[in-house]
Each structure stands twice: as C-alpha cells, then as structure tokens.
Swiss-Prot record:
Its EC number(s): 7.6.2.2, 7.6.2.3
Location in the cell: Cell membrane; Cytoplasm, Cytosol; Cytoplasm, Cytoskeleton, Spindle pole; Nucleus
Membrane topology recorded in Swiss-Prot or TrEMBL: Peripheral membrane protein
Residues flagged as site, Arginine finger: R232
Protein name, as recorded: RalA-binding protein 1
Role of this protein: Multifunctional protein that functions as a downstream effector of RALA and RALB. As a GTPase-activating protein/GAP can inactivate CDC42 and RAC1 by stimulating their GTPase activity. As part of the Ral signaling pathway, may also regulate ligand-dependent EGF and insulin receptors-mediated endocytosis. During mitosis, may act as a scaffold protein in the phosphorylation of EPSIN/EPN1 by the mitotic kinase cyclin B-CDK1, preventing endocytosis during that phase of the cell cycle. During mitosis, also controls mitochondrial fission as an effector of RALA.
Chain residues that bind ATP: G69, K70, K71, K72, G73, K74, G418, G419, I420, K421, D422, L423, S424, K425
Organism lineage string: Eukaryota, Metazoa, Chordata, Craniata, Vertebrata
Subunit annotation: Interacts with the GTP-bound form of RALA (via effector domain); during mitosis, recruits RALBP1 to the mitochondrion where it promotes DNM1L phosphorylation and mitochondrial fission. Interacts with DNM1L; mediates its mitotic kinase cyclin B-CDK1-mediated phosphorylation during mitosis to promote mitochondrial fission. Interacts with the mitotic kinase cyclin B-CDK1 during mitosis. Interacts with the GTP-bound form of RALB (via effector domain). Interacts with REPS1; the interaction is direct and does not affect RALA-binding nor GTPase activator activity of RALBP1.
Length: 655
C-alpha cells in the first residue's frame, strides 16, 4: 500500500470516502478544495469571487474550478501516488492570510495518485479557455476591487494628488470641440498685386502708392544719396527679412534705425515680389516696339501715349521710381551709379528691358516732368503715457496732424470691423483717439488765443478820445465776439459744476465700497488664520504639502502679475474716460450756444415781422387784448436773461 496523508476523521471528506462503493479513493472536487477551506493551496493573496451554484448552469465551470484546474496542471507530472489528497506542511494561520509574502512560501503541496488513474478522468479537469472579452472583463473587475481596497488606506494628501492626476488626464478628453470660425487673415504686403497693396497701405495724402515704397524712397532720398554703390551693394539679409516681416504685419517701422543699403535692398525685394509687370503684359511688347522708332521724337510721343494707357497705380509707381533713380544718377560722384549701373540693377528687378529703361532715363523731363516726390509725414505717436507728445504749435500744423490721425483712425476701424483680431491695432486705436482729443483741444485754445490777440490789438489801436458812434459800429463785431466768449465760459462753468457734483457723489459711493471690501478682507483673513491653526498638525504630516505650497505660490505670483497688468489697463481706460468727458462737456457747451443763438435769431425775426399798428401807439391785438407800446419793450428787456456770475457760483459750490 502506498502512503497517503489523510485528513482527520472528523472531516467531511472521510465520510464521503466511506460512503463510496468501491475501495478506491476519488479525487476531491473544486468545491471540497476551495480557498476558504484550504487557504494555503493558492498563491494569490486576493479573495476569490463568490461562488454561487444556484445561479450557474450545470454545464458552466465556476471560476474556482478554473483556477483549480490551472493549479493542477502544474503538478500533473508529479502525481504518481495512488491517493489524490493534498498534504499541507502546516495549517495556515490568520497572519498568513493577511500577508501575501507568507502565503507565497507555503507552496509545498504533495499530490498522490494511483498510476492506473484513467485519462478520461483527467479530461474532466481540463478547462476550456475563456474568450478574450471575458478575460478582459475579469481583469477590469479585479483592478477595480484592488483600487477600492487601496482607496480605503489612502490619506487625504494622496486623495488630493490622485484627483489632480485624474483631472490632468481627463482635461484633453473633456475639452469640447470648438467650432472653427473662419477668421479673415490678411495677406502679406509683399507679393500681392499693386492695387491691393495700395488699398491697404495708402497714406493719408491720397497718393495711390504703397507705404513701403514711399517710405523707402523718402529714406534713400534723405540718407542714401551719399552712399557709394546704393542699390548695387546688398544689405544684411536678416535685417531685410526683419523689415519685410514688419511691413507684412502692417506695423509702423522706423527706417532710420537701419542702413541705406538695407532699405534699398528692401525696396528691390518689394519690386521683385510684385506678381505683375509694372508696364503690364499687354503694353510691354508695344514699349519694346516703340524703342525701335527711328527718331527720338517719335519714341517720346509713343512712350507718352503708352504711359497714359497704364493703370493709375502702375503709372505713379514707375514715374516715382524713374524720377528717384534719376536723382541717384545725378549724384554720380557720391553714389558711383550711372545709367548703365542703374539699368543693370533695375532691369532684372522690375522685369523691364535695358532699352526701355534707357529711354526712360534719357527723357525724364519729357515723360515725367510734372512728377514731384512728396515727402511722407508719419502720424504722431503717443507711445509713453507718462509724457505728453510734442504737438504742433500753429493752427495749420494742428489741422494737418488731425487729418493724418483721422485717416489712420478710419483705417483701424475698417480693419477691426472686418473681423481681424489684433491687440496691437486695438491699442493703436486708443492711442489715436487720445492724440485726436489732445489735438482738438489745442486747436480750440489756439483759436481762442488768436481771437484774444486780435481783440487786444484792435483795442490798443483805438484811442479813447476818438471814440464815436461810427467807430462803435465798426467794433460791433469785436463786442459780439466778447459776448459769445462770455456765454461760452459761463455755460462751460455750469457743465463743470454739474460734473463736479456727479464726481463727488461717485467718490463717496466708492469710499463706502472700499470700506465694505476692507471689512470682508479682514473677516476672510481671520477665517484663514483660524483654519490654519486647526490644520497645522495635519499639514505637517502630509508629504505633498511642499508641492501644494509651491503650486499655490506660482498661482499667487501669476495672479499678482495679471493684477498689475489690469491696473495699468484700468489707468489707461480711466484717462480715456476722463478725456471723453471733457470732450462731451465741450460739445454740450457748443450745443447750448447754438440753441441760444437760434432762439435769439428767431426772436429777432419775429420782432422784425411785427408791423406797427395804429401809428406805433398800440400793438396789434393778441388774443383779443390790446397791448400798449410800452409793453413792447418788455420782451426786449427780458430778451437777455440774467447771466450767472462766476464769483457767485464759486461761493455756492466750493471746489
């Protein structure tokens, strides 16, 4: 007989063996050998899923039987004994069930079978492999249980850390798809048709030429006429690309920071990138034919006729270019550039043959005698808010600058209303509005000073002895001007006093709001201090406290920086609002003056239309009542109401 390790007699397996009819022992089923009865049989430390026989069909094999079949396959070669019971080294204790490391050590399982055990019974223990989907579900189920078990042992800091990691992972998934909006993107200035570049960058004076062309021409005319090899020597490529990118973005550039050769190379680059020939494809062969005429007179006449057929933009650009190059040739001693050199440089750039260029350069006066290169005056800038820009002193200069700023303002409005989102253009819009307000204010002051000086000169020229009625009639215009100025000053004073009262009320409400916010801040600070004292012990034990503090510090610095930027924007906005209020006051004053003048004119016209009735003794009946002539003088006396006195207003409202 072979040796067999049997369980105690009180175990249920012994009773089942006794009840069995044959003398052979049978292999225990998966229900008899389960992880709950024999915990040392399995390596895994996780509890097996509940096994419910009632809810399973008879043909389906349970999870415990599948696990048992896998384990039994490992020991299949070792089963050479007759008995099919497993002998354990020691009974598993409660400590082994808790620690998986101890359970791994308890692998000493000895299984004994009879050598005559049939292969048919072995097939009963073979398990069909699960489909991949079921395995995937089981793995997910186990992972979820493992996570639940871990979540019970986590601290608060670990929970916060896991929540942040989940949030970072979910962010790209949860972001909704933003619908694509077709934002109009402006094409660059270089490489677009000449007419489009003119429409986008034309200067305020109405000359239909691109801004980059005019600014380069002006710069070379001013600084490049003494530069040797101008247009022949190439500029620094990086500087040229930098200027090109700035003009493509329609940014204002200062060409005085660059060398003449760099600006000349930029001009050649612009002409080279033009998609169409300056003389057009249709007229270019005819210009070539005109060069073959026998006499110079015929050449000039044919060229004049062909130049008139060119589009306006093309004619202006070719005329300005030839006149400018003629100025360069005239300075041949300094520039070392003659007609041949200029033609060699310009011919491949503008795609015009040397024959045509030679005719242009030799007959500049006949072809372009009336062309004058007008210098570009850039609009005034107010880049630094701390300092006031230098405004023109004369009225003519102020009016010219106002026209430039208004043209620029219209261009900016056109671009922004077209759907182009550009923060630099929005800031430039505010800047132009501030400059316009300052210019209009200075223009009014200049007009007032001119009027005052004129009045003072006229008064000084008069002598007190020669004052007569005729002279008083001559000075009636001066008196009317003085009265109009007085009315304007008084109405302006009334508007300013009304604004003062409004601002005082606003300041009082703002002070109350400040006090309320201070009280809220103090209350929040006290709550924070109380909360910190309660959580000091917990925060000292947390491992991720330093990381949270660093993140909070970074967030705080970011918020402080954003707050500073918002304060700067707020100051700019307040200043703009203040300027707009001043402009509104001035408009109100003008409106009131116009209303007063209109009322006075209507009253005067009404008095002139009233005929004298009954020899002027009695006025015509009004509503059946006769009015004497003395009553006629009453509206005249009440025609001009009592004007407010500035000294009395100052006493009433202390500023």
């Amino acid at each position: 007989m072979t040796e067999c390790f049997l369980p105690p007699t009180s175990s249920p397996s012994e009773h089942r063996r006794v009840e069995h009819g044959s003398g052979l022992t049978r292999t225990p089923s998966s229900e008899e050998i389960s992880p709950t009865k024999f915990p040392g049989l399995y390596r895994t430390g996780e509890p097996s899923p509940p096994h419910d026989i009632l809810h399973e069909p008879p043909d389906v094999v349970s999870d415990d039987e599948k696990d048992h079949g896998k384990k039994k396959g490992k020991f299949k070669k070792k089963e050479k004994r007759t008995e099919g019971y497993a002998a354990f080294q020691e009974d598993s204790s409660g400590d082994e069930a808790e620690s998986p490391s101890k359970m791994k050590r308890s692998k000493g399982i000895h299984v004994f079978k009879k050598p005559s055990f049939s292969k048919k019974k072995e097939k009963d223990f073979k398990i069909k492999e699960k489909p991949k989907e079921e395995k995937h579900k089981e793995e997910k189920h186990k992972e979820e249980k493992h996570k639940e078990k871990k979540s019970k042992d986590l601290t608060a800091a670990d929970v916060v850390k896991q929540w942040k990691e989940k949030k970072k992972k979910k962010k790209p998934i949860q972001e909704p798809e933003v619908p694509q909006i077709d934002v109009p993107n402006l094409k660059p200035i270089f490489g677009i048709p000449l007419a489009d570049a003119v429409e986008r960058t034309m200067m305020y004076d109405g000359i239909r030429l691109p801004a980059v062309f005019r600014e380069c021409i002006d710069y070379v005319e001013k600084y490049g006429m003494k530069c040797e090899g101008i247009y022949r020597v190439s500029g620094i490529k990086s500087k040229v690309d930098e200027l090109k990118a700035a003009y493509d973005r329609e940014e204002s550039t200062n060409l005085e920071d660059y060398e003449p050769n760099t600006v000349a190379s930029l001009l050649k680059q612009y002409l080279r990138d033009l998609p169409e020939n300056l003389l057009t494809k249709e007229l270019m062969p005819r210009f070539e034919e005109a060069c073959g005429r026998t006499t110079e007179t015929e050449k000039v006449q044919e060229f004049q006729r062909l130049l008139k057929e060119l589009p306006e933009c093309n004619y202006l650009l070719i005329s300005w270019l030839i006149v400018h190059m003629d100025h360069v040739i005239a300075k041949e001693l300094e520039t070392k550039m003659n007609i041949q050199n200029i033609s060699i440089v310009l011919s491949p750039t503008v795609q015009i043959s040397n024959r045509v260029l030679y005719v242009f350069f030799t007959h500049v006066q006949e072809l372009f005698g009336n062309v004058v290169l007008k210098q570009v005056m850039k609009p005034l800038r107010w880049s630094n808010m701390a300092t006031m820009p230098t405004l023109p002193e004369t009225q003519a200069g102020i009016k010219e600058e106002i026209r430039r700023q208004e043209f620029l303002l219209n261009c900016l409005h056109r671009d922004l209303q077209g759907g182009i989102k550009d923060l630099s253009k929005e800031e430039r819009l505010w800047e132009v509005q501030r400059i316009l307000t300052a210019l209009k204010r200075k223009l009014r002051e200049a007009k007032r000073q001119e009027c005052e000086t004129k009045i003072a000169q006229e008064i000084a020229s008069l002598s007190k002895e020669d004052v007569s009625k005729e002279e008083m009639n001559e000075n009636e215009e001066v008196i009317n001007i003085l009265l109009a100025q007085e009315n304007e000053i008084l109405t302006e004073q009334e508007e300013l006093l009304a604004m003062e009262q409004f601002l005082r009320r606003q300041i009082a409400s703002e002070k109350e709001e400040i006090e309320r916010l201070r009280a809220e801040i103090a209350e929040i600070q006290s709550r924070q201090q109380h909360g910190r004292s309660e959580t000091e012990e917990y925060s000292s034990e947390s491992e991720s406290e330093s990381e949270d503090e660093e993140e909070l510090q970074i967030i705080l610095e970011d918020l402080q920086r954003q707050n500073e930027e918002l304060e700067i924007k707020n100051n700019h906005l307040n200043q703009a609002i203040h300027e707009e209020r001043e402009a509104i006051i001035e408009l109100r004053v003008q409106l009131r003056l116009l209303q007063m003048q209109r009322a006075k004119a209507e009253q005067q016209a009404q008095e002139d239309e009233e005929p004298e009735w009954r020899g002027g003794a009695v006025q015509p009946p009004r509503d059946g009542v006769l009015e004497p002539k003395a009553a006629k003088e009453q509206p005249k006396a009440g025609k001009e109401p009592a004007k407010p006195s500035p000294s009395r207003d100052r006493k009433e409202t202390s500023i």
